[in-house]
Amino acid sequence: MIEADRLIQPQIQAQDESIDRAMRPKMLDEYTGQDHTRAQLKVFIQAAKNRNEALDHMLIYGPPGLGKTTLAMIVANEMGVNIKSTSGPVLEKAGDLAALLTNLESGDVLFIDEIHRLSPVVEEILYPAMEDYQLDIMIGEGPAARSIKLDLPPFTLVGATTRAGALTSPLRARFGIPLRLEFYNIKDLSTIVTRSAQVMELDIDAEGAFEIARRSRGTPRIANRLLRRVRDYAQVKHDGAVTKFVAEHALDLLDVDSEGFDYMDRKLLLAIIDKFIGGPVGLDNLAAAIGEERETIEDVLEPFLIQQGFIQRTPRGRIATARAYQHFELIKPE
């Protein structure tokens, strides 16, 4: 298994939560990046407010660490309603979901992270709640059992997932607003790093912020995590200010290279290049070669490498691109 404390993993770590909460934007105007998604949300939110209606159900999907939870909270803030948060694996029984639904007030947001991991029995309860704002509950057992319907106030379900394809078709079809989050560009990440530094009361210049941003794999959560480690280095080894020089040396010490790769990324790329002559190589063989699970490669390691053009996924398997060879100063065989 991949190490849980990998510095550049996009999944949330225990130390991220309290600090990320302080750095999160509260309203859409404070939210940086994802311009198309922001523009859509502004229209949908204003329209719902004009009609005095609950916002339509929303599915936010994309790689981890891009701000799905933050967007859900922003939606609640913009609508002026409460938000209740849970996750798919936590909702084990129908009663778990029923307890949440019956405590919602009109217009409230129910946020379910990892919604693709809902159990079938819980999902069945969710369908009438989403479509008709009704909750079907079974009373009694055996032949005497009967179903009663409870009316629910209009509410907005915001589901978040890193694996939209894992949702069942009936569940996916019930979301009126699907939003895909993309990896961030370096300019937007630099803005996020600068804003986070202000929250931390940390002196950072534009070049220092840029250096952290370009090694952050297009992911705000990673950018904020790297910023905290660079701050440590700046305070111990320098005068506390973050410049390009300080950021470069701090990140080199942390083994995060110019592309944002750590040893796991390099291990994956070099396995394709050295052990499989650049590929193509099947996922099972690649997983065995680097000692990782298929899911870890698909969900954690690959997305950024593919998006940045270091790996190609073909019907025959994974291939290392010319850019991967160039990164290691190797010559790609013809």
Swiss-Prot record:
Its main location: cytoplasm. Residues 185-255 are annotated as: Small ATPAse domain (RuvB-S). Keywords: ATP-binding, Cytoplasm, DNA damage, DNA recombination, DNA repair, DNA-binding, Hydrolase, Nucleotide-binding. Mg(2+) binds at T69. PANTHER family: HOLLIDAY JUNCTION BRANCH MIGRATION COMPLEX SUBUNIT RUVB (PTHR42848:SF1), PTHR42848. The RuvA-RuvB-RuvC complex processes Holliday junction (HJ) DNA during genetic recombination and DNA repair, while the RuvA-RuvB complex plays an important role in the rescue of blocked DNA replication forks via replication fork reversal (RFR). RuvA specifically binds to HJ cruciform DNA, conferring on it an open structure. The RuvB hexamer acts as an ATP-dependent pump, pulling dsDNA into and through the RuvAB complex. RuvB forms 2 homohexamers on either side of HJ DNA bound by 1 or 2 RuvA tetramers; 4 subunits per hexamer contact DNA at a time. HAMAP family: DNA_HJ_migration_RuvB (MF_00016). This is Holliday junction branch migration complex subunit RuvB. It comes from Shewanella baltica (strain OS155 / ATCC BAA-1091).
